């Protein structure tokens, strides 16, 4: 990265930020789709039932913890790979 000029560094940073936003939106979309499908069953009311709300809270918490754990493992493996070089 030190070999890039200022403009190239800015372009690179912008690409990284765009990728991060895209990844975040993909994660959020997956979370919404999965938890909605698993938890929301009653369409006779505008409001969620207490059971559905509880399910959604647990589902989203579990999904985010899983995603965080996968990210940590990826970082650990990446660090181990970099040490081998």
Curated annotation (Swiss-Prot):
Keywords: Chaperone, Disulfide bond, Membrane, Metal-binding, Mitochondrion, Mitochondrion inner membrane, Protein transport, Translocation, Transport, Zinc. GO terms for cellular component: mitochondrial intermembrane space protein transporter complex; TIM22 mitochondrial import inner membrane insertion complex. One of its GO terms (biological process) is protein insertion into mitochondrial inner membrane. The keyword GTP-binding does not apply. The keyword DNA-binding does not apply. It is a peripheral membrane protein. A motif (Twin CX3C motif) lies at residues 35-59. Its main location: mitochondrion. It is found in: Mitochondrion inner membrane. InterPro entries: Mito_inner_translocase_sub, Tim10-like, Tim10-like_dom_sf. Disulfide bonds join 35-59, 39-55. GO terms for molecular function: metal ion binding; protein transporter activity; unfolded protein binding. It comes from the Eukaryota. Heterohexamer; composed of 3 copies of TIM9 and 3 copies of TIM10, named soluble 70 kDa complex. Associates with the TIM22 complex, whose core is composed of TIM22 and TIM54. Interacts with the transmembrane regions of multi-pass transmembrane proteins in transit. The twin CX3C motif contains 4 conserved Cys residues that form 2 disulfide bonds in the mitochondrial intermembrane space. However, during the transit of TIM9 from cytoplasm into mitochondrion, the Cys residues probably coordinate zinc, thereby preventing folding and allowing its transfer across mitochondrial outer membrane. Belongs to the small Tim family. Mitochondrial intermembrane chaperone that participates in the import and insertion of multi-pass transmembrane proteins into the mitochondrial inner membrane. Also required for the transfer of beta-barrel precursors from the TOM complex to the sorting and assembly machinery (SAM complex) of the outer membrane. Acts as a chaperone-like protein that protects the hydrophobic precursors from aggregation and guide them through the mitochondrial intermembrane space. This is Mitochondrial import inner membrane translocase subunit TIM9. The gene is TIM9.
């Amino acid at each position: 990265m030190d070999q890039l000029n200022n403009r190239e560094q800015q372009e690179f940073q912008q690409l990284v930020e765009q990728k991060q936003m895209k990844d975040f939106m993909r994660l959020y979309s997956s979370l919404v789709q999965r938890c909605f499908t698993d938890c929301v069953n009653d369409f006779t009311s505008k409001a969620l039932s207490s059971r559905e709300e509880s399910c959604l809270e647990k589902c989203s918490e579990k999904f985010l913890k899983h995603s965080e754990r996968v990210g940590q493992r990826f970082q650990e493996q990446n660090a181990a790979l970099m040490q081998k070089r």
